[in-house]
């Protein structure tokens, strides 16, 4: 297969797909370990590479298991932290809070969600999406 025929995900095409109306917004992103590009780069790194050109990345949010899968055991809550390299908050949505609080959303203009799910009712990711949408109303 030639390089030109490779599958590209929307994450791989952000510069051409990012809406002009959202240019330079303060962005938060809800991500998990399967949030990756076609080259298997985690979405947080892809988003950071566009920080300051398409949007301003201000916060990350992680569901059950954490945004990078740091808590793989089932039903293990985790606490938020400050990203050690980017100095932005990484909020836990599977700890003290299950949905973003007004304080977490303060200063954000948009919340991007990139989480794959199998569609089974016992998976928590679909509920995390719902709770994020409700918090952003």
Q: PLM features: residue spans?
A:
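Glycine-rich oxoanion-binding loops at beta->alpha junctions
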Residues: 73-108, 120
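Short internal beta-strands
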Residues: 56-67
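Short, well-ordered alpha-helix to beta-strand connector turns
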Residues: 25, 108-109
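Short glycine-rich anion-binding loops that position phosphate/pyrophosphate groups of nucleotides
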Residues: 35, 66, 116-119
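Glycine/threonine-rich flexible loop motifs
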Residues: 117-129
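Catalytic-core regions built around general acid/base machinery
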Residues: 43-50, 128-136
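N-terminal phosphate-binding or glycine-rich loops at protein starts, especially the Walker A/P-loop
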Residues: 6-56
């Amino acid at each position: 297969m030639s390089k030109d025929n490779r599958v590209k995900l929307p994450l791989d095409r952000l510069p051409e797909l990012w809406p002009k109306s959202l240019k330079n917004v303060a962005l938060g992103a809800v991500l998990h370990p399967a949030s990756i590009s076609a080259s298997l780069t985690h979405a947080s790194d892809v988003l950071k590479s566009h920080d300051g050109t398409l949007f301003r990345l201000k916060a990350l949010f992680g569901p059950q298991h954490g945004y990078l899968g740091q808590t793989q055991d089932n039903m293990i809550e985790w606490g938020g932290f400050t990203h050690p390299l980017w100095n932005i908050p990484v909020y836990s949505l599977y700890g003290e809070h299950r949905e973003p609080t007004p304080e977490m959303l303060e200063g954000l203009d948009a919340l991007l969600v990139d989480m794959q799910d199998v569609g089974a009712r016992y998976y928590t990711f679909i509920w995390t999406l719902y709770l994020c949408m409700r918090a952003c109303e």
